[in-house]
């Protein structure tokens, strides 16, 4: 138990603690583990050396300040899409998770399937939230709003209903 607490303390020391504003706030594995092992707010350390967000993609945002280096995103990217758009350098707490392209996710082989977002336990990878833009468009009487379901959604939606990764559920939506 002490080894786990020590490891969690090291992860917490390098973690961006913007939990209140994080999309994973109520479903964060790191928060759950910290609570389970008795960490309190007083043990949080100040934010230092924050990395810039990777906003190069039109669909995803990557925040390495929240990354706990679990490599789930790397594994699912290689397994689900076989594109390996995300990679890692270094070992242990020195590991850095990065897009395969140094120019960011948009320049990598990423196909915007969202699998990495689904497996990220801390919100280091999130979808760009366009809810407000959609609400404005729906409320505008001068606009015709058309809904289109992207191919990635047709495949990813099936996983919520326990279909194998990549099964197209078009016609079942």
Can you annotate each of these PLM segments?
Residues 1-2, 127-173:
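Iron-sulfur-associated redox domains of electron-transfer enzymes in respiratory
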């Amino acid at each position: 138990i002490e080894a786990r607490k020590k490891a969690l303390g090291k992860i917490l020391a390098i973690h961006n603690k913007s939990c209140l504003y994080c999309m994973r706030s109520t479903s964060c594995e790191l928060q759950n583990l910290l609570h389970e092992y008795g960490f309190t707010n007083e043990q949080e350390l100040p934010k230092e050396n924050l990395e810039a967000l990777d906003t190069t993609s039109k669909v995803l945002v990557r925040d390495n300040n929240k990354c706990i280096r679990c490599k789930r995103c790397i594994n699912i990217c290689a397994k689900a899409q076989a594109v390996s758009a995300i990679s890692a350098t270094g070992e242990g707490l020195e590991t850095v998770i990065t897009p395969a392209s140094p120019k960011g996710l948009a320049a990598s082989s990423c196909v915007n399937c969202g699998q990495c977002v689904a497996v990220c336990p801390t919100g280091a990878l999130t979808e760009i939230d366009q809810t407000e833009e959609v609400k404005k468009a729906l409320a505008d009487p001068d606009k015709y709003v058309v809904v289109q379901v992207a191919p990635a959604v047709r495949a990813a939606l099936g996983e919520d209903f326990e279909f194998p990764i990549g099964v197209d559920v078009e016609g079942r939506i």
